[in-house]
């Protein structure tokens, strides 16, 4: 089954061109199926690009999914037309009474700021507490993963001396966990971050398990034993050219970024990257939707408040 998105959302034409089955809301309304309700709290500056990346990952399951795009505040994003935000996004306050089967909280380019200096940190804390009562399973990406661990368990990130950027090999640490079902023992994923929380810090929290990690990146996929919280410290959603765009953006800005590791063939930016992460990225989200969301969510979402 497809993801359900608004008929006029620009992401629809991009996904259709990639042969991804997308159903607009008009057609979906004719089917007598209770779709999964999934929210995407999009914290990235380029909302439209991020929408496509996560919608692509949500599309590869037999489940019908109704997607709400959510903004955390009314501040106009720098790289997205306000007309797009008004047409396709809901303010968090407007969905605060709703329950969701799943919620994705994206990353944000805020690694160099203390949490208390993030302009929407107080609202972010409200969202994190709200999700405990309104969402069956929440997946936090990159910055959001660190922010959630800090809020819930007081584990603060440290800043690396140099940005971690590139494609890195990871090892599955718990092959029996359903989130890792079908994964190769070693698989690749993109990272682009300054912040890091040690494997030991994750493992020190009762009820959390590190499911995949590497010596270079540290913990990559971490999940709570009750399947309600998933922390992904990298970017499995990234497009083939995402790291290339970041690298060239920083060069243009007069910075001296390190070249993304294991990304360009022969470390030559003139060559397109060899994509080695998309299959496992898709599998991660398929497993999350199936085993952590669909097989655990109540039919009556209103009962989620009893799980908090």
UniProtKB/Swiss-Prot annotation:
Its EC number is 2.3.1.46. It is an enzyme of class 2 (transferase). Belongs to the MetA family. Keywords: Acyltransferase, Amino-acid biosynthesis, Cytoplasm, Methionine biosynthesis, Transferase. The record marks 111 as: Important for acyl-CoA specificity. It comes from Pseudoalteromonas atlantica (strain T6c / ATCC BAA-1087). It is found in: Cytoplasm. SUPFAM superfamilies: Class I glutamine amidotransferase-like. Its main location: cytoplasm. Transfers a succinyl group from succinyl-CoA to L-homoserine, forming succinyl-L-homoserine. This is Homoserine O-succinyltransferase. GO terms for biological process: L-methionine biosynthetic process from homoserine via O-succinyl-L-homoserine and cystathionine. The keyword Amino-acid biosynthesis applies. Substrate binds at residues 163, 192, 249. Pathway: Amino-acid biosynthesis; L-methionine biosynthesis via de novo pathway; O-succinyl-L-homoserine from L-homoserine: step 1/1. One of its GO terms (molecular function) is homoserine O-succinyltransferase activity. It catalyses: L-homoserine + succinyl-CoA = O-succinyl-L-homoserine + CoA. One of its GO terms (cellular component) is cytoplasm. The gene is metAS. The active site is at residues 142, 235, 237. The record marks 192 as: Important for substrate specificity.
